[in-house]
């Protein structure tokens, strides 16, 4: 009889052990899922958290963009790339350790696409940069007694030639910025020099493209001079003729203007009475600089990634 009882209870104990093991596996799985979800939530909180020095970042970007805009406005056409490049070197040297010295919505966008900047910070950078450019406009307008008045009638105008110039120049510039920032061993002075030099090269490259485009437009005008008529907006020539150069910066383009007919003839600083100064801030500049920044920054990431794989 004792033997029969033992044989009956053995399967029950085995079943109990299996059930206990299953419960343990279930508990472990639940704990693992909870741990993963907790880690993800912490990561989201970290990405959306604003830095403690946000006000310092905003003020630094306002001041930096203000200085860069003034440099772009008062630089001569011949040496503008050098003057603006030196101005950016100075800006990076003084505020680079505070905000990174973007002073350019396109640079901010490019770094964001490279995942070098939190999404929550992008509106603050853009707002500060445009505020700095507007401060420069107000200052110049007050110094000229209202002679520096802007018109935004050309905001929706689109020229593929101007788009190409801005895109190529911005791509070259941000490619250089990404390369400098990747080199952690470079000191602050070296970074300032490298970033300023990248802007110079970007302006020179796009400026050379601009000269070819202008030459082509002038040759076409001379060929069709007998049938040339004034456009509806009062202009005689295509828009490419009125562009003194590229901006590579949507904030700076807010203050930079296209030349008027009188300025083309006399190289004057201010337009003649009754003429409009059209702001370079337009859809073509915005789209070209943002796309160019994303292309330049991510192209460097691709090249640098392939280089690491080969090593």
Residue ranges and their predicted role:
Residues 2-311:
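Membrane-interface helix-loop junctions and terminal tails of multi-pass membrane proteins
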